[in-house]
Amino acid sequence: MRNKILIVGLLFGMGVAIALDQRQRFEAPAMRWLYPGFLERLPSVTGLRLSKAGDGVDLVFDNGTWVVAQRFNYPVNDKPLFQLLDQLDRARLIEKKTALSKHHGALGLLEDASDSGSVLMFQGDTLLKPVVIGQQASTRPGTFVRFQSDDQVWLIDQALEVSAAAADWLAPSLLTINDQMIESIELSNPGEVKYRVVRDERDNWVLAATPEGRTLRYDTALTPLATTVGQLRLLDIALHDPARWVGAGSAVYQLTSSHRLTLRTAAAQEGYWLRIVVDSDEVDPSDASDATLQVKAVEPKRSPALDQVLGPSREALTRFDFRIAKRNFDDLNRSLEHFLKPQDGEEIDG
């Protein structure tokens, strides 16, 4: 079904352009298509493989969903996939270049070399021949390509940018949430004072308990705690490892929908990690073990409101740990002192 939706989207999105292209065939000399009839052949495609210098990724159409095979069949980021398919459908061979293989390196069209091009292969339709994607042209929009079985180089009229790294194709959304959906926030990090943030009568974020003699740096100092959660972006995934979460910090977001999200964060040698748990109000996330939270996450309350908030599926939340950017990690681990105005004699920490 999703494959059909993707095709319908391509048809509607390119309808005007296709009509213009067809009219131009009668007004200008015809140019060859990179893949004639590509859109009509798309329903038979069951997967794409992109490889470069020993690295490679398989995007597979599995049970109605495009997934990344090298990442445990995690959903694909539709945006770059849609763009790539759109460009391949539009691509024309506008200029014939060299047919001498000795010049392939200069155009980024070698295979199995450190400066090689990306090889794109289709699964499910043998008429869509593998193509090597090289450098982009410097004088006009376009990309040098050649079919894998042919030394002849062509310039096409599309600027193709593709990646053979599996992590680059993962659906990046983690949480779709805004300030007004949050009722309160509680941060608890190792070695730091636990604190809770709530709204005051003017709807500003304030500390539930301000340390005696201290004030916030400025009135809206706590606002980033509410906005950060909607700006989280997934960089990669790994199978859930309980050992990764020993001593991890947590940020608990109580939502106006009565759901509660516990965002656990951990720093490791390979990067910064996030674990998202949907738990019930009976469990105190700061006291519960990861095993307890994981059980609660298997069957959280089902609600359209919660489904709109969560990027990953419920199963993915239980199965995976999510790698995030350092800035996201830092934002979810701000100490209480970070938000307070320095005391007399203290230097201001920007």
Give residue spans per PLM region.
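A short-motif feature that recognizes glycine-rich, charge-decorated loops
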Residues: 1-350
